[in-house]
Protein backbone atom coordinates (compact mmCIF):
# COMPACT_ATOMS: atom_id res chain seq x y z
CA UNK A 1 0.00 0.00 0.00
CA UNK A 2 1.34 3.43 -1.01
CA UNK A 3 1.63 6.30 1.44
CA UNK A 4 1.70 9.63 -0.35
CA UNK A 5 3.26 13.04 0.29
CA UNK A 6 3.20 16.12 -1.94
CA UNK A 7 6.28 18.22 -2.69
CA UNK A 8 5.73 21.85 -3.66
CA UNK A 9 9.10 22.84 -5.12
CA UNK A 10 10.53 26.36 -5.43
CA UNK A 11 7.25 28.28 -5.71
CA UNK A 12 8.95 31.42 -4.48
CA UNK A 13 7.94 35.00 -5.13
CA UNK A 14 10.89 36.04 -7.25
CA UNK A 15 10.66 32.95 -9.45
CA UNK A 16 6.88 32.92 -9.86
CA UNK A 17 6.83 36.63 -10.71
CA UNK A 18 8.90 35.83 -13.82
CA UNK A 19 5.97 33.89 -15.32
CA UNK A 20 4.06 35.85 -18.00
CA UNK A 21 0.87 36.00 -15.92
CA UNK A 22 2.70 36.58 -12.65
CA UNK A 23 2.01 32.99 -11.65
CA UNK A 24 -1.80 33.25 -11.55
CA UNK A 25 -2.49 30.04 -13.49
CA UNK A 26 0.15 28.01 -11.67
CA UNK A 27 -0.80 29.17 -8.18
CA UNK A 28 -4.50 28.58 -8.90
CA UNK A 29 -3.76 24.97 -9.88
CA UNK A 30 -1.39 24.51 -6.96
CA UNK A 31 -4.03 25.92 -4.59
CA UNK A 32 -6.46 23.26 -5.81
CA UNK A 33 -3.82 20.54 -5.35
CA UNK A 34 -2.89 21.82 -1.88
CA UNK A 35 -6.55 21.97 -0.81
CA UNK A 36 -7.04 18.37 -1.98
CA UNK A 37 -3.90 17.24 -0.11
CA UNK A 38 -5.10 18.89 3.08
CA UNK A 39 -8.56 17.30 2.73
CA UNK A 40 -7.03 13.88 2.06
CA UNK A 41 -4.50 14.35 4.88
CA UNK A 42 -1.62 14.00 2.44
CA UNK A 43 1.44 15.64 4.01
CA UNK A 44 2.66 18.72 2.19
CA UNK A 45 6.37 19.51 2.05
CA UNK A 46 7.32 22.91 0.71
CA UNK A 47 10.82 23.04 -0.74
CA UNK A 48 12.61 26.40 -0.99
CA UNK A 49 15.76 27.07 -2.92
CA UNK A 50 18.01 29.06 -0.61
CA UNK A 51 20.88 30.93 -2.19
CA UNK A 52 21.33 33.26 0.75
CA UNK A 53 19.01 36.05 -0.44
CA UNK A 54 16.01 36.67 1.82
CA UNK A 55 13.57 37.60 -0.93
CA UNK A 56 14.14 34.55 -3.11
CA UNK A 57 13.38 32.18 -0.24
CA UNK A 58 9.88 33.56 0.39
CA UNK A 59 7.17 31.11 -0.70
CA UNK A 60 4.53 32.78 -2.85
CA UNK A 61 1.83 34.12 -0.54
CA UNK A 62 -0.97 32.61 -2.67
CA UNK A 63 0.07 29.10 -1.59
CA UNK A 64 1.51 29.88 1.82
CA UNK A 65 2.07 26.82 4.02
CA UNK A 66 0.27 26.39 7.30
CA UNK A 67 2.41 26.46 10.44
CA UNK A 68 1.98 22.69 10.83
CA UNK A 69 3.31 21.99 7.32
CA UNK A 70 6.93 21.26 6.59
CA UNK A 71 9.27 23.71 4.85
CA UNK A 72 12.72 22.49 3.83
CA UNK A 73 15.50 24.55 2.31
CA UNK A 74 17.81 23.24 -0.38
CA UNK A 75 20.91 24.57 -2.08
CA UNK A 76 20.90 22.27 -5.12
CA UNK A 77 18.35 21.50 -7.85
CA UNK A 78 17.28 18.20 -6.26
CA UNK A 79 15.11 18.43 -3.17
CA UNK A 80 16.91 15.33 -1.88
CA UNK A 81 20.54 16.47 -2.06
CA UNK A 82 21.83 17.58 1.35
CA UNK A 83 18.33 17.95 2.85
CA UNK A 84 16.32 15.94 5.37
CA UNK A 85 13.69 14.99 2.79
CA UNK A 86 14.73 11.36 2.33
CA UNK A 87 14.96 10.67 6.08
CA UNK A 88 11.60 12.41 6.67
CA UNK A 89 9.96 10.30 3.94
CA UNK A 90 11.45 7.16 5.44
CA UNK A 91 10.27 8.04 8.95
CA UNK A 92 6.76 8.71 7.62
CA UNK A 93 6.64 5.54 5.51
CA UNK A 94 6.20 7.57 2.32
CA UNK A 95 6.47 5.52 -0.88
CA UNK A 96 4.72 7.80 -3.37
CA UNK A 97 5.40 11.48 -4.10
CA UNK A 98 3.33 14.03 -5.95
CA UNK A 99 5.76 16.61 -7.35
CA UNK A 100 4.73 20.12 -8.43
CA UNK A 101 6.29 23.55 -8.61
CA UNK A 102 8.73 25.76 -10.46
CA UNK A 103 11.47 25.36 -12.99
CA UNK A 104 10.43 22.24 -14.86
CA UNK A 105 13.78 21.65 -16.56
CA UNK A 106 15.90 22.25 -13.47
CA UNK A 107 14.63 21.63 -9.94
CA UNK A 108 11.48 19.70 -10.85
CA UNK A 109 13.38 17.38 -13.20
CA UNK A 110 16.21 16.84 -10.70
CA UNK A 111 13.75 16.12 -7.87
CA UNK A 112 11.68 13.68 -9.95
CA UNK A 113 14.74 11.75 -11.07
CA UNK A 114 16.21 11.71 -7.55
CA UNK A 115 12.90 10.42 -6.17
CA UNK A 116 12.75 7.72 -8.84
CA UNK A 117 16.35 6.66 -8.12
CA UNK A 118 15.42 6.28 -4.44
CA UNK A 119 12.52 3.97 -5.26
CA UNK A 120 9.59 6.36 -4.88
CA UNK A 121 6.59 6.19 -7.18
CA UNK A 122 6.29 9.70 -8.62
CA UNK A 123 3.09 11.40 -9.76
CA UNK A 124 3.09 14.69 -11.68
CA UNK A 125 -0.21 16.51 -12.17
CA UNK A 126 -0.26 18.26 -15.56
CA UNK A 127 -0.13 22.01 -15.39
CA UNK A 128 1.27 22.01 -11.85
CA UNK A 129 4.86 22.52 -12.95
CA UNK A 130 6.01 25.66 -14.72
CA UNK A 131 9.03 27.39 -16.16
CA UNK A 132 9.88 30.41 -18.29
CA UNK A 133 10.74 30.72 -21.98
CA UNK A 134 14.38 30.21 -22.89
CA UNK A 135 16.36 30.79 -26.06
CA UNK A 136 15.45 27.33 -27.42
CA UNK A 137 11.90 26.55 -26.27
CA UNK A 138 8.84 28.30 -24.97
CA UNK A 139 7.78 27.46 -21.44
CA UNK A 140 4.88 25.41 -22.80
CA UNK A 141 7.18 23.43 -25.13
CA UNK A 142 9.56 22.72 -22.25
CA UNK A 143 6.75 21.56 -19.96
CA UNK A 144 5.22 19.30 -22.63
CA UNK A 145 8.62 17.89 -23.61
CA UNK A 146 9.46 16.89 -20.04
CA UNK A 147 5.99 15.53 -19.26
CA UNK A 148 5.57 13.52 -22.47
CA UNK A 149 9.11 12.65 -23.55
CA UNK A 150 11.28 12.56 -20.44
CA UNK A 151 9.15 11.67 -17.41
CA UNK A 152 6.07 9.73 -18.57
CA UNK A 153 6.66 5.99 -18.38
CA UNK A 154 10.25 6.41 -17.24
CA UNK A 155 10.48 8.44 -14.06
CA UNK A 156 6.89 9.39 -13.29
CA UNK A 157 3.24 8.94 -14.05
CA UNK A 158 1.65 12.05 -15.54
CA UNK A 159 -2.01 12.70 -14.71
CA UNK A 160 -4.41 15.51 -15.41
CA UNK A 161 -4.96 17.55 -12.27
CA UNK A 162 -8.70 16.85 -12.51
CA UNK A 163 -8.23 13.06 -12.56
CA UNK A 164 -5.86 13.21 -9.63
CA UNK A 165 -8.21 15.39 -7.60
CA UNK A 166 -11.12 13.02 -8.25
CA UNK A 167 -9.31 10.03 -6.74
CA UNK A 168 -8.93 9.23 -3.08
CA UNK A 169 -5.35 8.56 -2.11
CA UNK A 170 -4.02 5.45 -0.48
CA UNK A 171 -3.15 6.31 3.10
PLM features: what roles do these ranges have?
Residues 13-18:
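Short acidic, Gly/Ser-rich segments with clustered Asp/Glu that frequently serve as metal-coordination loops
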Residues 2-5, 32, 40, 52-171:
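Active-site-adjacent betaalpha module
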Residues 5-11:
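N-terminal nucleotide-binding beta1-loop-alpha1 segment
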Amino acid sequence: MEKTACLIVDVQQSVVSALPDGGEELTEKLSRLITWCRQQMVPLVYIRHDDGEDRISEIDSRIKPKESEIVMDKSYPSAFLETDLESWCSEQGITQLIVAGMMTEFCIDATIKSAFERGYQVLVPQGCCATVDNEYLTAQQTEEFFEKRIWQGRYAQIFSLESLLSQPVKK
